[in-house]
From Swiss-Prot:
Key enzyme in the regulation of glycerol uptake and metabolism. Catalyzes the phosphorylation of glycerol to yield sn-glycerol 3-phosphate. Homotetramer and homodimer (in equilibrium). Heterodimer with EIIA-Glc. Binds 1 zinc ion per glycerol kinase EIIA-Glc dimer. The zinc ion is important for dimerization. This is Glycerol kinase. The gene is glpK. Pathway: Polyol metabolism; glycerol degradation via glycerol kinase pathway; sn-glycerol 3-phosphate from glycerol: step 1/1. The keyword Nucleotide-binding applies. Pfam families: FGGY_C (PF02782), FGGY_N (PF00370). ATP binds at T13, T14, S15, T267, G310, Q314, G411. InterPro entries: ATPase_NBD, Carb_kinase_FGGY, Carb_kinase_FGGY_CS, FGGY_C, FGGY_N, Glycerol_kin.
């Protein structure tokens, strides 16, 4: 019998990846392609949907060729994706009517201000689990329909379709036969009622978005359709798992029980805590979102999103030219014993949880004559850990659960300095898994469970090997002293930009 594999497609903010996994959850082959970031105006971020598709489909062909695996050896494909990014395209031609508006894009801040003025904040929080912020898809879709001539009428006639990136990829992979999303992605649109598990008529009405353009919403682990892309001949492969990247990582870390949490250090930082079948309403600026239970069914989670994590290290490299490679940041940070009193607040696109201030801007505080580039590099790394503590404090207050260990993943977890400082500043154990590709793992697990490739999560439990554990190495007084300096710095970076700009 030929060995069968699972493929995870991981469509991220800066690159598209394909990962092949075997039955023991080992990574057999990986392929990755970066694509262009488009910045039409300050604070605006776009992608070309056709380039997203081209990069993702080519990685799929490439990853199979690399491993010398034929398409009939693929048991299923799972998809995980950058969330909230909004795409609108023509049903007939499959052609986008505008670029994808990316989750980081702040262009809809004025639409969000109007929603607040109209007194909708409580309704939105209670029903969608979200805060009013340009981050989510709903206001992005409204912006496209407002600015592309004739598009709203066409959407009403059923000629246009909306989707997050998962929906767009599946539409392309099935040649326009399947228009679908899953609960985790739908819960990020600000258009979805997370309690009724259906699109919210009031939100569609408020944002003037025709229901006809929305995808069908399904659970995260089931067969949605078939694709024969990248295959020799006509082998049809089931597409059987979908989850937004952060929910996929939560599942890949096997945080499927109430009170388990993970933090992903990518472009941004995303901490999620599974709250089981209970949708916990946050009083502390966190999001209530949908996650996956043990067999991909609906569970709820609390989430805190930090917009700038790895992106702030890229800023040190690309704009400030203080390092030539992101990996060098650890070396330079450890050349000094502390930050010499410096705090970097990387609020380049405003602040996420728990502050939610789109008008905050980046700042460096505490500069004195003795500060050198190493101090600034170290302070930038430390800012990632401080922002994570901001989120964890809010999470513990909302859930009433004291976290005993934080599971971590994402590119920046290779940085031992950052992981140790993270443990120091949280006063909590930090667990780094052996397999770092947990987002892809999550998508693969969801797809594999749907087609019976794996029977249940117990089979996967032993795959969750912790490679290294970091334990707090500083005293509580020192920890709190440093953290209070951070809070002071954040306060001063807030509300920098004028509201009416």
């Amino acid at each position: 019998m030929t060995e069968k594999y699972i493929v995870a497609l991981d469509q991220g903010t800066t690159s598209s990846r394909a990962v092949v996994m075997d039955h023991d959850a080992n990574i057999v082959s990986v392929s990755q392609r970066e694509f262009e970031q488009i910045y039409p105006k300050p604070g605006w971020v776009e992608h070309d949907p056709m380039e997203i598709w081209a990069s993702q489909s080519s990685t799929l062909v490439e990853v199979l060729a690399k491993a010398d695996i034929s398409s009939d050896q693929i048991a299923a494909i799972g998809i995980t994706n950058q969330r909230e990014t909004a795409i609108v395209w023509e049903r007939e031609t499959g052609k986008p009517i505008y670029n994808a508006i990316v989750w980081q894009c702040r262009r809809t801040a004025n639409i969000c201000e109007q929603l607040k003025r109209d007194g909708l904040e409580d309704y939105i929080r209670d029903n969608t689990g979200l805060v009013v912020d340009p981050y989510f898809s709903g206001t992005k879709v409204k912006w496209i329909l407002d600015h592309v001539e004739g598009s709203r009428e066409r959407a009403k006639r059923g000629e246009l379709l909306f989707g997050t990136v998962d929906t767009w990829l599946i539409w392309k992979m099935t040649q326009g036969r399947v228009h679908v999303t899953d609960y985790t992605n739908a819960s990020r649109t600000m258009l979805f009622n997370i309690h009724d598990l259906d699109w919210d008529d009031k939100m569609l009405d408020v944002l003037d978005i025709p229901r006809a353009m929305l995808p069908q919403v399904r659970k995260s682990s089931e067969v949605y359709g078939q694709t024969n892309i990248g295959g020799k001949g006509g082998t049809r492969i089931p597409i059987a798992g979908i989850a937004g990247d952060q929910q996929a990582a939560l599942f890949g870390q096997l945080c499927v029980k109430e009170g388990m949490a993970k933090n992903t250090y990518g472009t941004g930082c995303f901490m999620l805590m599974n709250t089981g079948e209970k949708a916990v309403k946050s009083e502390n600026g966190l999001l209530t979102t949908i996650a996956c239970g043990p067999s991909g069914e609906v569970n709820y989670a609390l989430e805190g999103a930090v917009f700038m994590a790895g992106a702030s290290i890229q800023w040190l490299r690309d704009e400030m030219k203080l390092i030539s490679d992101a990996f060098d940041s650890e070396y330079f940070a450890t050349k000094v014993k502390d930050t010499n009193g410096v705090y970097v607040v990387p609020a380049f696109t405003g602040l996420g949880a728990p502050y939610w201030d789109p008008y905050a801007r980046g700042a460096i505080f505490g500069l004195t004559r003795g500060v050198n580039s190493n101090h600034i590099i170290r302070a930038t790394l430390e800012s990632i850990a401080y922002q994570t503590r901001d989120v964890l404090e809010a999470m513990q207050a909302d859930s009433g659960i004291r976290l005993h260990a934080l599971r971590v993943d994402g590119g920046a977890v290779a940085n031992n300095f950052l992981m140790q400082f993270q443990s120091d500043i949280l006063g909590t154990r930090v667990e780094r898994p052996e397999v770092r590709e947990v987002t892809a793992l999550g998508a693969a697990y969801l797809a594999g469970l749907a087609v019976g490739y794996w029977q249940n999560l117990d089979e996967l439990q032993e795959k969750a090997v912790i490679e290294r554990e970091f334990r707090p190495g500083i005293e509580t007084t020192e920890r709190n002293y440093r953290y209070s300096g951070w809070k002071k710095a954040v306060k001063r970076a807030m509300a920098w930009e004028e509201h009416d700009k």
